UniProtKB/Swiss-Prot annotation:
One of its GO terms (biological process) is tRNA wobble position uridine thiolation. Its EC number is 2.8.1.13. Gene3D superfamilies: Adenine nucleotide alpha hydrolases-like domains (2.30.30.280), HUPs (3.40.50.620), Translation factors (2.40.30.10). It comes from Caulobacter sp. (strain K31). It catalyses: S-sulfanyl-L-cysteinyl-[protein] + uridine(34) in tRNA + AH2 + ATP = 2-thiouridine(34) in tRNA + L-cysteinyl-[protein] + A + AMP + diphosphate + H(+). One of its GO terms (cellular component) is cytoplasm. Disulfide bonds join C137-C235. This is tRNA-specific 2-thiouridylase MnmA. InterPro entries: MnmA-like (IPR004506), MnmA-like_C (IPR046885), MnmA-like_central (IPR046884), MnmA-like_central_sf (IPR023382), Rossmann-like_a/b/a_fold (IPR014729).
Length: 409
């Protein structure tokens, strides 16, 4: 087992704000909820959040093992500012683990990440969807494969630097997933697919902190990454140009087609449906009187359908690959019961009220969400994350949007 915090020599305790540090350590202990000395794997990406997570757990007296996944290593993505899990970030994680005084392992998951995240990302665009690879990464590589590694290492829990909270309601025997204390950093949207079994094993020590506090803790500990920029956008997409990745992974996938007005008029040509997303206005290169937006993508017909902004208004959507953390057994069961929910269709938006219904069909039917009002620019492929209207901080689950019902179509 790891030594207690008094034995972690690399930390410069003389320069530490003990009030801040004591609060942070106690918060980490509370988030873990396991006896001091328990082995915990800390997922370390090389960023500020995961590094502080590992450091706080070590100071709290846990037996911490740092694990970093090498997920990709191609071209400009390696040196992209704000990337993670490649190149310099792996070196940063290794150096941080050495300073903290914990063992550190780097695991090569490049081929698995390529297959489960990058290729799925490209294929989703070819299907006319707008994918959300961060959810796929958490759902597969990080919260499935890495949890298996943690168990193989003899850990009782795995901690990450995500900004979400895990807590128990009175009398409950299973934890809830809840939004972070800092709304600006809340990552619950990206973790909706976390299963109840995974949540039993996971810990999120930073969920009750804000980012300025985390950076202060990093600075007090003398960690070199205290001022390192946050990761931005999609980690494996160089300079935000996602079409570069698609063209490399599926070089002959995107074929030209027609830009079609929703009234049936052909307005021009496009270079491939992968260049467009629902709600897009720029880059259409068509000259008409009123502003037009992408309202639908028909990949089978190679058509990008455009219309006025009001055509983006959505009254309902269908979900696939659902995950459910509520009292019902599944998302389908909650939908069959007509459960009221708060629904969030983009990470940058607040949840809005709606109600689940179930469309009869194979495999238990298809969950459907009907909004109380109208929601703009809902895109197939994105996540729809569901929260409890009686307790809006609680994540109930969600699914991936497979189809939408437009008010204007």
């Amino acid at each position: 087992m790891a030594a207690m915090d008094a034995d972690i020599a690399p930390f410069d305790t003389a320069r530490t704000d003990h009030g801040l540090m004591d609060r942070a350590v106690e918060q980490a202990r509370a988030a873990v909820g396991l006896p001091v000395g328990t082995r915990i794997v800390a997922a370390m990406s090389g960023g500020v959040d995961s590094t502080v997570t590992a450091a706080l757990l070590a100071k709290a007296g846990y037996d911490v093992v740092g694990v970093t996944l090498q997920l990709y290593d191609h071209g400009a993505a390696i040196t992209k500012k704000g990337a993670c899990c490649a190149g310099q970030d792996i070196l940063d994680a290794r150096m941080a683990a050495e300073r903290i005084g914990i063992p550190h392992y780097v695991l090569d998951y490049e081929s698995r990440f390529k297959e489960q995240v990058i290729e799925e990302f490209a294929d989703a665009y070819l299907r006319g969807e707008t994918p959300i690879p961060c959810v796929r990464c958490n759902q597969t590589v990080k919260f499935r494969d890495l949890l298996d590694v943690a168990r193989d290492l003899g850990a009782e829990a795995m901690a990450t630097g995500h900004y979400v909270q895990r807590s128990f309601a009175a009398g409950a025997n299973r934890p809830q997933l809840r939004r972070a204390a800092d709304p600006a950093k809340d990552q619950s949207y990206f973790l909706f697919a976390t299963t109840a079994e995974q949540l039993d094993f996971l810990r999120f020590p930073l969920g009750g902190m804000d980012k300025p506090t985390v950076r202060l803790v990093a600075a007090e500990l003398g960690l070199a990454i205290a001022d390192k920029p946050d990761s931005q956008d999609i980690c494996f997409v160089p300079e935000g140009k996602y079409t570069t990745v698609i063209d490399r992974i599926r070089p002959h996938g995107a074929l030209p087609g027609d830009l079609v007005h929703m009234d049936g008029r052909v307005l021009g040509r496009h270079e491939g449906v992968t260049r467009y997303t629902i709600g897009q206005r720029r880059g259409l290169n068509i000259a008409v009187g009123d502003p037009l937006f992408v309202v639908k993508i028909d990949a089978d017909k190679r058509q990008v359908i455009v219309g006025p902004r009001e055509a983006l208004l959505t009254q309902a959507l269908s979900l696939k690959e659902g995950n459910w953390l509520g009292v019902e057994d599944s998302l389908e069961a909650a939908a069959a019961a007509g459960a009221p929910v708060l629904a969030r269709v983009r990470s940058t938006r607040e949840p809005v009220p709606g109600r689940l219904t179930l469309v009869p069909g194979p495999n238990g039917g298809e969950p459907r969400l009907v909004f109380d009002g109208l929601e703009e620019g809902v895109a197939p492929g994105q996540a729809c994350v569901l929260y409890d209207p009686a307790d809006p901080e609680r994540v109930l689950g969600g699914g991936f949007i497979v189809a939408t019902e437009r008010a204007g179509l």
